[in-house]
Amino acid sequence: MTNDTVSDMLTRVRNANLAKHQVVQVPATKMTKSIAHVLLEEGFIESIEEVGLDINRQLLLSLKYKGREREPVINALKRISRPGLRVYANRKELPRVLGGLGIAVISTSKGVLTDTKARTQGLGGEVLCYIW
């Protein structure tokens, strides 16, 4: 088990995307579940399924591809805040990823949200990652 489950999740999704896998398996924690639900709401993945027993719970994420060439919907994932260097932003400093084409995943007091939802609710928080 790794200490940084968010980085582990992003790396697994990135590698599965590059290898054009249909499904990727990530450890199920509260944070990875929340990030997976944000990815599902934003249309980056097709579905989420939780499998396994209590201690070994896993999330199965169905990745999304477009066209005949099976181009990945997720072009890149970038971890921003990490255990060694936390990055926080208040509501006025929330980042825009690629001028609004991508999303920033923010951990707020109201849960894990995208940058646009956090901005409309007037919330700041920890900037977890960028996805475009």
Swiss-Prot record:
Places the protein is found: Plastid, Chloroplast
GO MF annotations in UniProt: rRNA binding; structural constituent of ribosome
GO biological processes: translation
SUPFAM superfamilies cross-referenced by the UniProt entry: Ribosomal protein S8
Family matches, as InterPro entries: Ribosomal_uS8, Ribosomal_uS8_CS, Ribosomal_uS8_sf
Primary site of residence: plastid
Pfam families the UniProt entry points to: Ribosomal_S8 (PF00410)
UniProt xrefs under PANTHER family: 40S RIBOSOMAL PROTEIN S15A (PTHR11758)
Protein family membership: Belongs to the universal ribosomal protein uS8 family.
Subunit structure: Part of the 30S ribosomal subunit.
Protein's name according to its UniProt entry: Small ribosomal subunit protein uS8c
Record gene name: rps8
